[in-house]
Swiss-Prot record:
Organism of derivation: Serratia proteamaculans (strain 568)
Stated name of the protein: ATP-dependent protease subunit HslV
Keyword Manganese: no
Cysteine-cysteine disulfides: none
Organism superkingdom: Bacteria
This enzyme's EC code(s): 3.4.25.2
Coiled-coil intervals, chain numbering: none
Compartments, record wording: Cytoplasm
Family to which this protein belongs: Belongs to the peptidase T1B family. HslV subfamily.
Gene: hslV
Length: 176
């Protein structure tokens, strides 16, 4: 899988992800960009799971953002509804971490839209390691959101065999 981490702190929201794509036990590519900007650079999103599935979901999510004039929560709920009820979409295996200046959300294929505690998201195979690292840094340091994301991804990459040290990190100003 992968590791995606999102942290919101001191007027910034950041999502970062590693770049490893695997097929079974083999690393197929080390520089996949699993984090991208959507909706005129007002939303950032990262995916964990199947790459082709995630690109399909990014496309669908961007359409939902357009339909709802960039309203993140409405777009996420509508995507989750479609994902849960459409037979073809139900087969897609991925998780999305999405954020704008106001909200951070996890969108799952089960139709869940989750607003995480403390605006900290960590998904994918390395998610638990990155979450523990990020939480410790949030509680015990004054590091920026970007520094916390980068260091958390490095720690996950040291522990999780499905996470590497090629990072894509995007950030936005945050009101929350």
């Amino acid at each position: 899988m992968t590791t995606i981490v999102s942290v919101r702190r001191n007027g910034q929201v950041v999502i970062g992800g590693d770049g490893q794509a695997t097929l079974g036990n083999t690393v197929m590519k080390g520089n996949v960009k699993k984090v991208r900007r959507l909706y005129n650079d007002k939303v950032i999103a990262g995916f964990a799971g199947g790459t082709a599935d995630a690109f399909t979901l990014f496309e669908l999510f961007e359409r939902k953002l357009e339909m709802h004039q960039g309203h993140l929560v409405k777009a996420a709920v509508e995507l989750a509804k479609d994902w849960r009820t459409d037979r073809m979409l139900r087969k897609l295996e991925a998780l999305l971490a999405v954020a704008d200046e106001n909200s951070s959300l996890i969108i799952t294929g089960n139709g869940d839209v989750i607003q995480p505690e403390n605006d900290l998201i960590a998904i994918g195979s390395g998610g638990p390691y990155a979450q523990a690292a990020a939480r410790a840094m949030l509680e015990n340091t004054e590091l920026s959101a970007r520094e916390i994301v980068d260091k958390s991804l490095n720690i996950a990459g040291d522990i999780c065999i499905y996470t590497n040290h090629f990072h894509t990190i995007e950030e936005l100003p945050s009101k929350a």
